[in-house]
């Protein structure tokens, strides 16, 4: 596959600035901060934009826009290396699994994904090139690696983390365009959107005018995610009010560290935990004064699968179902 790339002038300036500052990227699977600042507390599925771009017809060459600018893919790839778990899941969901040669160490879903020891955190150009890829798909946290791959003529597609659900649908369709699976990708994007909306509307019907408060706990040190993040917007669709939005550093990257005192004072109705196991739920209940927190009192501390709660691929519906069930349980009390 031959890919040509055109960088926008604005991005060239940004790249130089980042290089000069010595900025390092963070984890590749962190979804980018969204522009939405606070939860709306209105329960309901998001409306589709009127200007949604149509998907291509599946022919090559095809030109798309990634995090680095315009990319032209001359022909359908046959040896894809995916270093992003979210994109790996999407590739298989749209029928491009047979075109995937290798995936990174954390791309563990679906089972048939050819998981290797390739790192998505610190990608190694030499290790990647050993798979003789005709397309490498990277997170935008690995821009330096992407530029190195392009420099040695390895076709590369750099996709940013989703900031909202519309990004999920758009990236699903984009992957369909660059792999030649446009019809399957369009069908999959429609499925995700339809099923997500159905889950939300079912929960909203039971919730009525009730507004529940919550926070998602990312680790035992009480780091959380605000409504300005991708995962925060999933909860926002259910009309939940995120107490993390009120945290002192809630506007600092969208991932504030809460204190036990803050949580007790805010008294959330629901707590979602995306790490650990059932013993973690017990440990949370034993924290000082947490026995007075509504979520603990009402057995409304819910354990989430960490992968499902952080990836923006086809399993975003599974994430919604977990949240929806928790909302319906609390609404019935």
What residues fall within each predicted segment?
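Bacterial Sec-exported substrate-binding components of ABC uptake systems
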Residues: 2-83, 183-215, 326-333
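A short, structured surface patch at a secondary-structure boundary
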Residues: 56, 63, 79-131, 135-141, ...
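Short helix-initiation/N-cap motifs at beta->coil->alpha
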Residues: 67-68, 116-126, 249-260
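Proline-aspartate-enriched helix->loop->beta-strand connector
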Residues: 77, 124-138, 154, 259-273
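Short, structured coil segments at secondary-structure junctions
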Residues: 96, 152-154, 238, 296-297
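Alpha-helical, coiled-coil/dimerization segments enriched in small aliphatic residues
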Residues: 107-108, 224-254
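Structured C-terminal subdomain patch of bacterial secreted/periplasmic proteins
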Residues: 144, 167, 173-176, 186, ...
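Extracytoplasmic ligand-binding site segments that recognize negatively charged/polar headgroups
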Residues: 144, 159-174, 208-234, 279-281
């Amino acid at each position: 596959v031959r890919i040509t790339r055109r960088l926008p002038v604005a991005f060239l300036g940004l790249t130089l600035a980042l290089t000069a500052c010595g900025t390092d990227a963070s984890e590749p699977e962190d979804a980018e901060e969204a522009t939405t600042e606070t939860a709306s507390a209105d329960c309901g599925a998001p409306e589709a934009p009127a200007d949604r771009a149509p998907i291509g017809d599946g022919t090559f060459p095809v030109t798309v826009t990634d995090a680095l600018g315009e990319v032209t893919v001359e022909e359908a790839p046959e040896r894809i290396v995916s270093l992003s778990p979210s994109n790996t899941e999407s590739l298989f969901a749209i029928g491009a699994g047979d075109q995937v040669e290798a995936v990174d160490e954390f791309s563990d879903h679906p089972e048939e994904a050819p998981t290797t020891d390739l790192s998505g955190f610190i990608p190694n150009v030499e290790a990647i090139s050993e798979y003789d890829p005709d397309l490498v798909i990277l997170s935008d946290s690995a821009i330096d690696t992407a530029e190195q791959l392009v420099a040695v003529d390895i076709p590369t597609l750099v996709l940013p983390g989703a900031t909202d659900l519309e990004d999920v649908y758009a990236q699903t369709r984009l992957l369909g365009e660059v792999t030649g699976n446009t019809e399957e990708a369009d069908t999959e994007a429609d499925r995700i959107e339809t099923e997500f909306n159905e889950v939300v509307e079912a929960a909203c019907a039971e919730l009525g005018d009730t507004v529940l408060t919550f926070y998602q706990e990312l680790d035992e040190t009480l780091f959380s995610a605000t409504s300005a993040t991708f995962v925060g917007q999933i909860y926002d669709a259910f009309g939940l009010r995120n107490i993390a939005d009120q945290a002192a550093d809630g506007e600092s990257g969208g991932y504030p560290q809460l204190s036990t005192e803050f949580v007790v004072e805010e008294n959330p109705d629901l707590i979602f935990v995306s790490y650990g196991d059932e013993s973690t739920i017990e440990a949370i209940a034993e924290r000082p004064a947490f026995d007075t927190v509504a979520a603990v009192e009402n057995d409304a501390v819910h354990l989430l699968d960490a992968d499902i709660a952080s990836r923006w691929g086809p399993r975003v519906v599974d994430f919604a179902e977990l949240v929806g069930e928790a909302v319906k349980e609390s609404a019935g009390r």
